[in-house]
């Protein structure tokens, strides 16, 4: 089999690194790297829930995604300066939130909110899938922090791990984890979010250049699930290390929260 432009096999991920404790203030903070794509993912805890959630006894998890102006080859203006959030940004923010809510028991949080922030420092394809993969680890650290503070009714509210990967058809070949040079010319482009129990959370797929048969879809899903299995191993290895910071004592006011 001929190799890709970057030397990888079709089913091979780019080098993936997950660094916990990347910043000190949030309960969970991760730098995730998929090759040259780098995303900072944080998980912050705040008391209270959205108005429509009040009185339910359940918590909430929300997510925001953004790209730094110089994350790509050409600088893009900050959306905060433009005065409105773009459609792509809203779509990815909602995707990250949906993906992580699939793995957590919100009732265990009480009426508290975990806010996930994913900021793309450098983009080379697959930013949304990198964000989801890194954000899960940040969420796991935030849960560890809340459990240590005695804030959870269930100390183990995470039912599974969540990871995501891009997969596409490029030059007629199914390839995983597409960098920008491949993503920009893919005939079929897909993002797959999965759990470590073998189930799917979300599939986003498009025939960019042409239609594609069901058999291709099945092969793409097989390739994506195999790649996610590798990502789960990387997540587990990262989370085997001790919590990257000082955990609170039960009953002690949580310091890693908004406004602290």
Swiss-Prot record:
<comment type="subunit">
    <text>Homohexameric ring arranged as a trimer of dimers.</text>
</comment>
<keyword id="KW-0698">rRNA processing</keyword>
<dbReference type="InterPro" id="IPR001247">
    <property type="entry name" value="ExoRNase_PH_dom1"/>
</dbReference>
<keyword id="KW-0694">RNA-binding</keyword>
<comment type="function">
    <text>Phosphorolytic 3'-5' exoribonuclease that plays an important role in tRNA 3'-end maturation. Removes nucleotide residues following the 3'-CCA terminus of tRNAs; can also add nucleotides to the ends of RNA molecules by using nucleoside diphosphates as substrates, but this may not be physiologically important. Probably plays a role in initiation of 16S rRNA degradation (leading to ribosome degradation) during starvation.</text>
</comment>
<dbReference type="GO" id="GO:0000175">
    <property type="term" value="F:3'-5'-RNA exonuclease activity"/>
</dbReference>
<dbReference type="InterPro" id="IPR018336">
    <property type="entry name" value="RNase_PH_CS"/>
</dbReference>
<dbReference type="InterPro" id="IPR027408">
    <property type="entry name" value="PNPase/RNase_PH_dom_sf"/>
</dbReference>
<dbReference type="GO" id="GO:0009022">
    <property type="term" value="F:tRNA nucleotidyltransferase activity"/>
</dbReference>
<dbReference type="GO" id="GO:0000049">
    <property type="term" value="F:tRNA binding"/>
</dbReference>
<feature type="binding site">
    <location>
        <position position="88"/>
    </location>
    <ligand>
        <name>phosphate</name>
    </ligand>
</feature>
<dbReference type="InterPro" id="IPR015847">
    <property type="entry name" value="ExoRNase_PH_dom2"/>
</dbReference>
<dbReference type="InterPro" id="IPR036345">
    <property type="entry name" value="ExoRNase_PH_dom2_sf"/>
</dbReference>
<dbReference type="InterPro" id="IPR050080">
    <property type="entry name" value="RNase_PH"/>
</dbReference>
<dbReference type="InterPro" id="IPR002381">
    <property type="entry name" value="RNase_PH_bac-type"/>
</dbReference>
<dbReference type="GO" id="GO:0008033">
    <property type="term" value="P:tRNA processing"/>
</dbReference>
<keyword id="KW-0548">Nucleotidyltransferase</keyword>
<dbReference type="GO" id="GO:0006364">
    <property type="term" value="P:rRNA processing"/>
</dbReference>
<protein>
    <recommendedName>
        <fullName>Ribonuclease PH</fullName>
        <ecNumber>2.7.7.56</ecNumber>
    </recommendedName>
</protein>
<feature type="binding site">
    <location>
        <begin position="126"/>
        <end position="128"/>
    </location>
    <ligand>
        <name>phosphate</name>
    </ligand>
</feature>
<dbReference type="GO" id="GO:0016075">
    <property type="term" value="P:rRNA catabolic process"/>
</dbReference>
<dbReference type="InterPro" id="IPR020568">
    <property type="entry name" value="Ribosomal_Su5_D2-typ_SF"/>
</dbReference>
<comment type="similarity">
    <text>Belongs to the RNase PH family.</text>
</comment>
<dbReference type="Pfam" id="PF01138">
    <property type="entry name" value="RNase_PH"/>
</dbReference>
<dbReference type="Pfam" id="PF03725">
    <property type="entry name" value="RNase_PH_C"/>
</dbReference>
<keyword id="KW-0819">tRNA processing</keyword>
<keyword id="KW-0820">tRNA-binding</keyword>
<keyword id="KW-0808">Transferase</keyword>
